[in-house]
């Protein structure tokens, strides 16, 4: 699949039609991907889902439940629900610690394999940081050495994209502003299986002001100028508890933070977001998630 194809391309003609921007949520899956995760998503009215396939704060690489995997995959296909996996937070290919890098390789390989098993379109991974006081160029060379081989392993038609998620700019972040993706993509040879997951809270906290009449569109223009058309595959739709440029990753419910509602509406009118799902990672449990999903749908449809 070429990078300029829609992230939702390939849906069969008998499946329900997709809205321009499916709106969904990260969902809990303890107890079963299908029996718990998709049930939660349906309760929200979610049109897209994101899941963990391992403890996000650990290195375990558990095997899946084949029955749950197949039921989840089949239901997502039948109902045209695009699914995504979020890799564990500990992954950092820029670490100065060899053990962390080795564990990062195995953890991400596991997430990519599990993504394929459940029919996920993409696996989201944070872009990491240059630890140990090392220069960014040294860390990016290490990213290339260890991450590019994992991308080259994605040889099946149903393998997921690897979606780089820039961070909020804390510490020695390798990638937070849109233009930071340029060296990152270059280090990975702009691999055809490489995409971007844009987190609105992160990019706002990193210094891109999404507010105002053209803030969201200018940010997306910069993204496209940096990585090219068709690379944006997923948006994490989160408001921010903190002001622009605060370098703090603290999510708020849609419209309840410093971003506000209007930028989310604007995001869903830019050419780069056509066909790109929005997934919330906001506070509030099921009730708060349902409210955020409904609010984003209204912003999209009105």
Regions picked out by a protein language model, each given a short descriptive name:
Residues 1-87, 91-112:
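N-terminal pre-domain/capping segments
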Residues 99-112, 135-148, 177-186, 214-221, ...:
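Short, electropositive alpha-helical surface patch
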Residues 77, 93-195:
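Active-site acidic/histidine proton-transfer and metal-coordination neighborhood
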Residues 49, 145-254:
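Acidic/histidine-rich catalytic cores of soluble enzymes
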Residues 41, 86, 104, 115, ...:
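Conserved, mostly hydrophobic/aromatic
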Residues 66-85, 143-157, 184-188, 258-270:
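Alpha-helix-loop-beta-strand connector modules within alpha/beta enzyme cores
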Residues 17-23, 45-47, 77-83, 117-121, ...:
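Short, well-ordered coil/turn segments that N-cap beta-strands
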